[in-house]
Amino acid sequence: MKLTCVLIIAVLFLIVCQLNTADDSRDKQEYRAVRLRDAIRNSRGSRSCGNLGESCSAHRCCPGLMCMGEASICIPY
């Protein structure tokens, strides 16, 4: 009997949490495409040059940086 009550309370608690989360995120999907575009634009694979401290073995360093060292990382001139 106690186990049944605990299970019922746990299920009700989880349902309330899901409903509360779904209600909070209802209006935030409006700009989803913009966030996705920005994430793709800023991803490591889409950049054409490496920033300070990044590896330059797969791509060239950004302007003002040069590839140097055994680890092949981008450093300032």
From Swiss-Prot:
Keywords: Disulfide bond, Knottin, Neurotoxin, Secreted, Signal, Toxin. Disulfide bonds join 49-62, 56-67, 61-74. Residues 23-47 form a propeptide. InterPro entries: Conotoxin. Belongs to the conotoxin O1 superfamily. It is found in: Secreted. Expressed by the venom duct. This is Conotoxin ArMKLT2-0322. It comes from Conus arenatus. It comes from the Eukaryota. It holds the Pfam family Conotoxin. GO terms for cellular component: extracellular region. GO terms for molecular function: ion channel inhibitor activity; toxin activity. Residues 1-22 form the signal peptide.
